[in-house]
Amino acid sequence: MFAIQSENYFVDNYSVSDLMMYPCVELNVEAAPTATTRSSEKSKRSRTAFSSLQLIELEREFHLNKYLARTRRIEISQRLALTERQVKIWFQNRRMKLKKSTNRKGAIGALTTSIPLSSQSSEDLQKDDQIVERLLRYANTNVETAPLRQVDHGVLEEGQITPPYQSYDYLHEFSPEPMALPQLPFNEFDANWASSWLGLEPTIPIAENVIEHNTQDQPMIQNFCWDSNSSSASSSDILDVDYDFIQNLLNF
């Protein structure tokens, strides 16, 4: 019992003695934040205010090179009357700004492309379907009602009308065949052809059926062969015939 009371008494005395012996502890605790704020104010750097000319030059250099070497950074700082650290920080901030803008644009593009086609109203979809059905019906009816043209083979043989897939005989159309002339056999040859064509009197009488049918089968070379032994044709007769023929030509 007494031990417990003594312990309680000791605790009470200790707590009271601490409060009485160290009365300035609270003052030190209150003074500590003021010292830290003063040190932070001293360490806080001032914000750099760039002029319009400096910003234009920095932006121009950023579009050319987003990352500067130290030699180039020193040149820019000397030309714009800035410190090397200011130029370095400005480029860092500018790169972060560009990165944020590109990420934002990419997010907006992803949202626009991710919109499903089902977002359209059902009425618009029905209208589109109806238009497609009408077009299909119109196309089918035109195909069915169009009659198939039957090509006349007789006309095609003459070379007047030809389908596009068939070869066209231009030579046959534009250069027709020569006019056929009647060909008379040798036995029916008119001996007085000059008199009939030129209007002259016949000099040699026409003998009918002079050449027999059996001689037609023989070659024509035998008719033109000259028989040296035959004396049927004399030189005087030949000269008379030739003279009369030449005289008729001269009179014409």
UniProtKB/Swiss-Prot annotation:
Transmembrane segments: none annotated. SMART domains: HOX. Gene3D superfamilies: Homeodomain-like. Keywords: Developmental protein, DNA-binding, Homeobox, Nucleus, Transcription, Transcription regulation. It is found in: Nucleus. It holds the Pfam family Homeodomain. GO terms for biological process: positive regulation of transcription by RNA polymerase II; regulation of transcription by RNA polymerase II. The keyword Nucleus applies. Its main location: nucleus. Residues 43-102 bind DNA. GO terms for molecular function: DNA-binding transcription factor activity, RNA polymerase II-specific; RNA polymerase II cis-regulatory region sequence-specific DNA binding. The keyword Nucleus applies. Signal peptide: none annotated. One of its GO terms (cellular component) is nucleus. Required for the differentiation of the dorsal-ventral pattern, and does not appear to be involved in the process of segmentation. This is Protein zerknuellt 2.
